[in-house]
Amino acid sequence: MAKVKVAILGSGNIGTDLMIKLERSSHLELTAMIGIDPESDGLKKAKTKGYYVFDGGLKQFLSEASELADLVFDATSAKAHVRHAKALREAGKMVIDLTPAAVGPYVVPSVNLGDYLEESNLNLITCGGQATIPIVHAINRVAQVHYSEIVATIASKSAGPGTRANIDEFTQTTAHGLEAIGGAKKGKAIIILNPAEPPIIMRNAVYALVECEQMDEVAIARSVQETVAYIQSYVPGYRLRTEPLFEGNKVTVFVEVEGAGDYLPTYSGNLDIMTATAIKVAEEWVQHRVKAASV
């Protein structure tokens, strides 16, 4: 099967890590990196590796070499993606959105990936969303979650300008994802940037208040374990810190994410889960497209 050509929009930490990961993909061929800072490490590395490099932003890419990619990963910011989405849609490009812009439908691979493969813009919510929404969904499969609250703690060093610019969108988009995808009737999200040295890996606390009459500790624990195993198939550093904890109708789950160390330090699990998920979604989209074409 021929690989699908892709481009990365955004030459920061996430875009550069994505570039390294794409080298291992059997379905995706990176052709170009697009940025606005010619001195960025991402654009410099991309040029060294022989990829096409555009430092005039998306406008330059679309006007000069749009044919280089059928799919574009947007690793910029939520505000920028709103503009990018329109231009990429008009250019007929498939888009995987790694910002909290939520222009397209929310996608969490373990929950609803197959539902939106005909869409042209898929949103990956946030790092906290990818780490915690599957857990809420796993609990909700067994017992209705009336309220869910998640606290995502990440190393301050792993939060670059893009992450810091997206804090408000992070909390809003993640909270909505807990409800729309996780199934909670009400969701709340909190993000903490921890300045500790040495930097900590990403840690997430998931709290869920469930329907008392539906509480089944064994079934909930099994459902959570199944979800964790699925996520580990594409994010190996994702794991439970402890077994799920139960108190009355409250379920508490602690998960952590250690990065693969491709471009980013291993403590940057919050960024790693986004890049790994982006590739998972893109590869599933490619396989879906191939199957559809063969029918």
From Swiss-Prot:
Enzymatic reactions: acetaldehyde + NAD(+) + CoA = acetyl-CoA + NADH + H(+)
The Gene Ontology biological process terms listed for this entry are: catabolic process
Q: What InterPro entries does the annotation carry? A: Acetaldehyde_dehydrogenase, Acetylaldehyde_DH_C, NAD(P)-bd_dom_sf, Semialdehyde_DH_NAD-bd
Instruction: Fetch the NCBIfam families from UniProt.
Output: ac_ald_DH_ac, PRK08300.1
Protein's UniProt keywords contain ATP-binding: no
Top-level taxon of origin: Bacteria
CDD domains hit by this protein = ALDH_C
Q: What is its EC number?
A: 1.2.1.10
Q: Any idea which UniProt keywords this protein has?
A: Aromatic hydrocarbons catabolism, NAD, Oxidoreductase
Q: Where does NAD(+) bind?
A: S11, G12, N13, I14, S158, A159, G160, P161, G162, T163, R164, A165, N166, N270
Protein name (Swiss-Prot/TrEMBL): Acetaldehyde dehydrogenase
Q: Which HAMAP family match?
A: Ac_ald_DH_ac (MF_01657)
Gene3D superfamilies assigned:
Dihydrodipicolinate Reductase, domain 2, NAD(P)-binding Rossmann-like Domain
Q: Which family does it belong to?
A: Belongs to the acetaldehyde dehydrogenase family.
The UniProt entry annotates the active site at C127 (acyl-thioester intermediate)
Entry GO MF terms: acetaldehyde dehydrogenase (acetylating) activity; NAD binding
